[in-house]
Amino acid sequence: MTRQSLWDVSDTDVEDGEIRINVGGFKRRLRSHTLLRFPETRLGRLLLCHSREAILELCDDYDDVQREFYFDRNPELFPYVLHFYHTGKLHVMAELCVFSFSQEIEYWGINEFFIDSCCSYSYHGRKVEPEQEKWDEQSDQESTTSSFDEILAFYNDASKFDGQPLGNFRRQLWLALDNPGYSVLSRVFSVLSILVVLGSIITMCLNSLPDFQIPDSQGNPGEDPRFEIVEHFGIAWFTFELVARFAVAPDFLKFFKNALNLIDLMSIVPFYITLVVNLVVESSPTLANLGRVAQVLRLMRIFRILKLARHSTGLRSLGATLKYSYKEVGLLLLYLSVGISIFSVVAYTIEKEENEGLATIPACWWWATVSMTTVGYGDVVPGTTAGKLTASACILAGILVVVLPITLIFNKFSHFYRRQKQLESAMRSCDFGDGMKEVPSVNLRDYYAHKVKSLMASLTNMSRSSPSELSLDDSLH
């Protein structure tokens, strides 16, 4: 194939080596050697075509007589393409849409690499900014959509009690158990639950003190009987909570898909497993090793602290923040991993002969981790001047690395906290019994959907407010 392959399809004299281009009515005559400077572009490949079929694959129409190639493209953008063929550089005017321009040069087979330096920074900045805004907007939209789904599911669950025996009574009991702050009864129940959780955690902590341990027949430390009474009362209360919520749940299958209910279940399962293991060990001494399993399960009591999430807006908001901020959290971990890897190797190279605590790279990982997170236990410290300078750089880098993603995560947290407060306020304001009496001729699902739409409007206005409106004191409640 030669550069004259195109001319073989026409009898017209081509000694001038020119072709005619018509782009949406914008006509120009171009010399072949100008186009062949860039053979990978659409017009450059057009000159190398040796059949009409190949030509029509690259343009929209072709006139054999006039040797005119027609392209159904935007004629206002083609002058920029034409300028590229003459100068080898692309320029982007400020009034142009960068995405339309990007699609246009992609059609002509021109790489963004040819954008001149005077326009490159502005072009790529304008192109990335909407994508970043779209990412943040999509993340907020997903979180807000989940709120709408959550409140709609709440109304749907409440409607399932209609027509059931004692339906209104069960609904009020369900609201009192599952929504702290819904009524006076729910507030009292919530306070009692919090006190029992805190009492159980405090008891577990005090039981680890030697002064409160009573040796058994074999001399092993055992629990104080008074603490066992508190523990058994706590288990009885937690079991009552779980059974009561399950008994009045509108959807039993959905009940076990709720993370808070799974936490309630996991808070009592270790106790009953431990009870069974102890009975088995007592009846069969050969299975004494199972006692270690019981000891491990007893340590799982600390997870009861998660039960407070049912009564704390801040904890639930934290959980939602971690769920929808996985990109920011991943970015934070990536930054820390890179910094730890670099500074641990540097510290190892400098201190391996002078400091036994930094004699291996894994040991330096620990040092770099506590330094970058600004914890600084002080168990391992560099001794040389170069090592101390490295430690200073590691700490400063850690501050910068941690602060940048934390700002994004806090903005997410403030958004979820305000949203959760709004949801709780909406749930507390619901009076299903009175509301249904006021609209006897309206379908219940339509009625609930109408309420959801009103809530959606308020949530949208709330999400547009500034994150700075949230005070640090409020986030702790």
Swiss-Prot record:
The chain crosses the membrane at residues 185-206, 226-248, 260-280, 291-311, 327-348, 389-417. GO terms for biological process: potassium ion transport; protein homooligomerization; regulation of potassium ion transmembrane transport. Residues 1-184, 249-259, 312-326, 418-477 are cytoplasmic. It is found in: Cell membrane. Its main location: membrane. Keywords: Cell membrane, Ion channel, Ion transport, Membrane, Potassium, Potassium channel, Potassium transport, Transmembrane, Transmembrane helix, Transport, Voltage-gated channel. SMART domains: BTB. InterPro entries: BTB/POZ_dom, Ion_trans_dom, K_chnl_volt-dep_Kv, K_chnl_volt-dep_Kv5/Kv9, SKP1/BTB/POZ_sf, T1-type_BTB, VG_K_chnl, Volt_channel_dom_sf. Residues 207-225, 281-290, 349-361, 382-388 are extracellular. CDD domains: BTB_POZ_KCNS2. Detected in brain, but not in the other tissues tested. Expression was highest in the olfactory bulb, cerebral cortex, hippocampus, habenula, basolateral amygdaloid nuclei and cerebellum. GO terms for cellular component: perinuclear region of cytoplasm; plasma membrane; voltage-gated potassium channel complex. It comes from the Eukaryota. The keyword Nucleotide-binding does not apply. A motif (Selectivity filter) lies at residues 374-379. GO terms for molecular function: potassium channel regulator activity; voltage-gated potassium channel activity. Residues 362-373, 374-381 dip into the membrane without crossing it. Potassium channel regulatory subunit that modulate the delayed rectifier voltage-gated potassium channel activity of KCNB1 and KCNB2 by altering their kinetics, expression levels, and shifting the half-inactivation potential to more polarized values. While it does not form functional channels on its own, it can form functional heterotetrameric channels with KCNB1 and KCNB2. Each regulatory subunit has unique regulatory properties that can lead to extensive inhibition, significant changes in kinetics, and/or substantial shifts in the voltage dependencies of the inactivation process. Heterotetramer with KCNB1 and KCNB2. Does not form homomultimers. Belongs to the potassium channel family. S (TC 1.A.1.2) subfamily. Kv9.2/KCNS2 sub-subfamily. The transmembrane segment S4 functions as a voltage-sensor and is characterized by a series of positively charged amino acids at every third position. Channel opening and closing is effected by a conformation change that affects the position and orientation of the voltage-sensor paddle formed by S3 and S4 within the membrane. A transmembrane electric field that is positive inside would push the positively charged S4 segment outwards, thereby opening the pore, while a field that is negative inside would pull the S4 segment inwards and close the pore. This is Delayed-rectifier potassium channel regulatory subunit KCNS2. It comes from Mus musculus.
